[in-house]
């Protein structure tokens, strides 16, 4: 996976649990 793909996946999970990571 590219960094961009990983970032997108992580940001989707963070959105579901109501958190926002700095890079999202």
From Swiss-Prot:
Localization, UniProt: Secreted
Domain of life: Eukaryota
Tissue and organ expression note: Expressed by the venom gland.
Cysteine amide: residues bearing it: 24
Cystines in this chain: 11-24
Chief place of localization: secreted
Keyword entries, A-Z: Amidation, Disulfide bond, Mast cell degranulation, Secreted, Toxin
4Fe-4S is among the record's keywords: no
GO terms of molecular function: toxin activity
Cellular component annotations (GO), alphabetically ordered: extracellular region
Function as written in the Swiss-Prot or TrEMBL entry: Wasp venom peptide that acts as a potent mast cell degranulating peptide without hemolytic activity. Shows neuroprotective effect, since it prevents the death of dopaminergic neurons of the brain substantia nigra region and recovers motor deficit in a 6-hydroxydopamine (6-OHDA)-induced murine model of Parkinson disease.
Family: Belongs to the sylv/frat/paul family.
Name by which UniProt lists this protein: Fraternine
Source species of the chain: Parachartergus fraternus (Artistic wasp)
